[in-house]
Amino acid sequence: MKLALEKFFALKAHNTNIQKEILAGITTFITMAYIIFVNPQMMAQSGMDYGAIFVGTCLAAAFACLFMGLYANWPVGLAPGMGLNAFFTYTVVGEMGYSWEIALGAVFIAGILFFIMSITPLRRWMLDSIPLNLRIAMGAGVGLFIGFIGLKNGGIIVANGATFLSLGDFTNPSTLLAGLGFLLISILSIRKIPGAIIIGILAVTLMSIFLNLIEFDGIFALPPDVTPVLMELDILGALDVTMISVIVSFLFVNLFDTAGTLFGVATRANLVEESGDIKDLDKALKVDSSSSVFGSFLGCAPVTSYVESSAGIEAGGRTGMTAVVVGILFLLATFLSPLAAVVPAYATAGALIYVAILMLSGMESLNWDDQSELLPALIMVVMIPLTFSIANGIALGFLAYVSIKVFVGEISKISSGAWFLTLIFVAKFIFL
């Protein structure tokens, strides 16, 4: 068995061993396990069955991780993506009024398009043709979107008729616990303690139990029935022309998020070859895109590679065996449904705020010297949360980019990809 594992994953060639890979897998799982609490809680607000989406989240993540490990041999964990799950629930279903079945159909279509791009030159064309500042702005804008939801769920900000928003009531135990959860996660992360986010979520949940704010129903149980969301996607409904901007948003946010994560992980895991090419990048992208398709069958928003995988790589993970361990742990997590169900929304608020802040870190790489590049990016970052729509924020960013470039005499610098997306967004605003 040991020799078979060493041969299959090429452990010696990657200067690692079974013990290191198992430890790395456990480390990665601990750092990203918060998704099994956050994702069902968020997706259930779209009308989906909580227990079913809990199991769907675990199964989608398990499939993706096992596929990544066994096919691509990358030490990367995958799960339904943060940000896109919020877009799914609050914008596509909540604001735009589509059913969650149609929204899942859009996830499926975006996944198919992503897969096609990953096996054709379209991927390189699109990655190269979208301005770097706008790619960075997408991630940062989604971060602010997540942070806004976290602040709202924690009661830290509340609606105000006179000023739109105001500070929440910190004499309310749930609001206070949400703030304490964020502080705890931040402190543990700064001290480099693995699993800081999930520790913060569970700590707030435990305090809530002691304060009799919630009822505790146990930790383990047989997995809930997944059939209420299984294969319930409405693909034909998602083919409506009004869904184009939604599909584009799912596609490109996932594409750039995945590309950024994989490029970063490849460097840390020594997967960059002497030629500068990344080893088996095409396989990793195929896994990511096909996992989104599979996840849509289980009621999930687009599945994506997690930057938290870097924690496992720091622990010594170098091969797909790390991802396989993560996948097995996600399968075992299906038995934690009672614990997941008892976690209150304010317990995950701190996690959302913390993840949001991490997503803003990419803004340091913006080109702050060229205002024709900077201003459209900042418009995108600001308008995603303020319009409460990733699709509208991205659209306004591209419209601003092309408009500014045209009128400052830099039309030749506008790439074909930027023109293509801008025309789609113009059509959206005029005809839809």
Q: Positions of the model-derived regions?
A:
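Helix-coil boundary and interhelical linker segments in multi-pass alpha-helical membrane proteins
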Residues: 41-52, 91-102, 241-244, 344, ...
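Helix-loop-helix hairpins and the membrane-proximal interhelical loops
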Residues: 1-52, 166-167, 198-282, 423-427
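Membrane-embedded alpha-helical modules
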Residues: 96-210, 214, 324-432
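Conserved, well-structured core segments that form the ligand-binding/active-site neighborhood
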Residues: 75, 205, 209, 316
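Helix-loop-helix junctions within the multi-pass membrane cores of secondary transporters/permeases
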Residues: 2-35, 39, 60, 80-139, ...
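Loop-to-helix transition at the N-terminal end of transmembrane alpha-helices
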Residues: 47-66
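Transmembrane alpha-helix interface/packing and boundary motifs in multi-pass membrane proteins
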Residues: 64-77, 186-192, 250-257, 288-298, ...
